[in-house]
From Swiss-Prot:
The encoding gene: PYR4
Protein name: Dihydroorotase, mitochondrial
Obligatory cofactor(s): Zn(2+)
Its EC number(s): 3.5.2.3
Species name: Arabidopsis thaliana
Pathway participation: Pyrimidine metabolism; UMP biosynthesis via de novo pathway; (S)-dihydroorotate from bicarbonate: step 3/3
Length: 377
């Protein structure tokens, strides 16, 4: 629901606009826009552990009702028992008044057994299994080396249990250009996987290319979906190099050409049910980003809703925002939509330059920049 709130002005109403000829300025009224939507969920989130977990989880909990929590810790969350323990740590780190619900995932390995999928389904806290091709991204060294050769029985059990597979969609062959790895993954892994197991529910995570958009749109609704990050909607690969090397715009998959960004924006603002919010918010201490070997990951959780609202507002599609942020994700997972609401106000505000914590600093996406939308607290 979009509301336009008008502040009173005696010279405006049913009368015509009056011009002050001496200054040639129009006397007009102040307008404030508010947008109330069903409270969103984040279908791809990194919360880390230890001090970092305690620092960042309140940012996500302040705006999102639920989140699919990534399992790429050290060591990774490869079992249901480990997922239950990790969830307890998250719950302890939440503010006392929070109703945030972390939805856990398992880290798929070459050694994962079908029995683990049955345990995960029975647990009531594990909602998906994450596929990291070994070496594709942060803490993925324990990931899958041969999906069809070593994981097929597990994938077949996932079909039986209606357990979604969340896919980091990049090949890791060093001979393949980093900007082509998503496209090649679709051709060599994802398309054969869908053909072999058409009943497997798959989420292609953090899509970055028009190739991914076209693939998802070609699939049967409800069988393949995609999460989309704010950075891949707002930035292209020029943002990595403008004004010098920009480590806080570095993530995996890397930003792509402008034509790909435009294709993703068009897809998510079209009203398609196949695309939904997944920030891939990935906090790293500033010293680990601004270094000779900077970590991949963009921290967007504190400002994510403002960023998504910016995308939809600029596309003239604010009426499509709620479906993307709040409906498409739970519908795909077969979960109820949230009953709670959140209101966004169009009022300029400045993103903090940095978030300070006892252990160090975290620089958010769009640090120091002005955004137009913000959630009301």
């Amino acid at each position: 629901m979009i509301k336009t709130l008008v502040s009173p002005y005696s010279g405006f109403g049913s009368q015509k606009l009056k011009f002050d000829r001496s200054s040639e300025k129009v006397k007009t009224r102040a307008v404030r826009m508010e947008l109330t939507i069903t409270q969103p969920d984040d279908w791809h989130l990194h919360l880390r552990d230890g001090d970092l977990l305690h620092a960042v989880v309140p940012h996500s909990a302040s705006n999102f009702k639920r989140a699919i929590v990534m399992p790429n810790l050290k060591p990774p969350v490869t079992s249901t028992a480990a997922a239950i323990i990790y969830r307890k740590f998250i719950m302890k780190a939440l503010p006392s008044e929070s109703s945030f619900d972390p939805l856990m995932t398992l880290y798929l390995t070459d050694k994962t057994l079908p029995e683990e999928i049955r345990l995960a389904r029975e647990s009531g806290v594990v909602y998906a299994v994450k596929l990291y091709p070994a070496g594709a991204t942060t803490n993925s060294q324990d990931g899958v080396t041969d999906l069809f050769g070593k994981c097929l029985p597990v994938l077949e059990e996932m079909v039986k249990q209606n357990m979604p597979l969340l896919v980091h969609g990049e090949v890791t062959d060093p001979s393949i250009d980093v900007f082509d790895r998503e496209k090649i993954f679709i051709e060599t892994v994802l398309q054969p996987l869908i053909q072999r197991l058409p009943q497997l529910k798959v989420v292609m995570e953090h899509i970055t290319t028009m190739d991914a958009v076209n693939f998802v749109e070609s699939c049967k609704e409800g069988s393949v979906g995609a999460t989309v990050t704010p950075q891949h909607l707002l930035l292209n690969r020029n943002a990595l190099f403008q004004g010098g090397l920009q480590p806080h715009n570095y993530c995996l998959p890397v930003l792509k050409r402008e034509i790909h960004r435009e294709a993703i924006v068009k897809a998510v603002t079209s009203g398609s049910k196949k695309f939904f919010l997944g920030t891939d918010s990935a906090p790293h201490e500033r010293s680990r980003k601004e270094s000779s070997c900077g970590c991949a990951g963009i921290y967007s959780a504190p400002i994510a809703l403002s960023l998504y609202a910016k995308v939809f507002d600029e596309a003239g599609a604010l009426d499509k925002l709620e479906a993307f942020t709040s409906f498409n994700g739970p519908d795909f997972y077969g979960l109820p939509r949230n009953s709670s609401k959140i209101t966004l106000k169009k009022s300029p505000w400045k993103v903090p330059d940095v978030f300070n914590f006892p252990f160090g600093e975290i620089v958010p996406m769009f640090a120091g920049e002005t955004l137009q939308w913000q959630p009301l607290k």
